[in-house]
Curated annotation (Swiss-Prot):
Disulfide bonds join 78-171. The keyword Transmembrane does not apply. Residues 1-18 form the signal peptide. Keywords: Disulfide bond, Lactation, Milk protein, Secreted, Signal, Transport. Mammary gland. Secreted in milk. It is found in: Secreted. Pfam families: Lipocalin. One of its GO terms (molecular function) is small molecule binding. InterPro entries: Calycin (IPR012674), Lipocalin (IPR002345), Lipocln_cytosolic_FA-bd_dom (IPR000566), von_Ebner_gland (IPR002450). This is Late lactation protein. It comes from Trichosurus vulpecula (Brush-tailed possum).
């Protein structure tokens, strides 16, 4: 009888903790973050998914908004990307504003300072979701990765469309 009780108790415990990864208020600390893994939910051209990623710097501005900065190489030119991040009425979502404005969902993992950002993107008239695991260093945290894979499985992302971008140093734009 005790074995049956413990089996049921452990099953319930694992079920209750299976959803540790939940949409939550996006409240990152200021600092440097790294995109560790990227997944897309539908067919998407490989060349459209970033293969090399520089560190992402998040800063809080005086008006309460956040700014994210990173650099990327495109056609052998370095481009600095600045994105404004604003909280929405739904604390689990943020709007990102650069050229286009779109709303992303934030998912907190079980590891501190590790987030999954899920952003929609229009491509050839279809909405594609892109999920990115973001962490405070280049070392991949096994628990955060486990949370990421559990999340993309739950959200029905295709496991064949997962990319681990190469971490690169930030480049210096010509105008800087």
């Amino acid at each position: 009888m005790k074995v049956l009780f413990f089996t049921i108790a452990l099953s319930l415990f694992s079920i209750l903790h299976a959803d540790d990864v939940a949409f939550s208020a996006f409240t990152p600390s200021e600092g440097t973050y790294y995109v560790q893994v990227i997944a897309v939910d539908k067919e998407f051209p490989e060349e459209e998914i970033p293969r090399d990623m520089s560190p992402l710097t998040i800063m809080y501005l005086d008006d309460g908004k956040m700014e994210a900065r990173f650099t990327m190489k495109k056609d052998d030119n370095c481009e600095e990307i600045n994105i404004m991040l604003e909280k929405t009425a739904d604390p689990r979502k943020i709007t990102m504003n650069r050229r286009l404005r779109y709303t992303c969902a934030a998912v907190r993992t079980s590891k501190q300072k590790h987030w999954i950002l899920v952003c929609p993107r229009e491509f050839q008239g279809e909405t594609i979701r892109m999920a990115k695991l973001v962490g405070p260093n280049t070392d991949k945290n096994p628990k955060a990765l486990e949370d990421f894979y559990r999340f993309i499985y739950r959200e029905r992302f295709d496991k064949r469309r997962i990319i681990t971008p190469k971490q690169t140093e930030a480049c210096a734009p010509e105008h800087a």
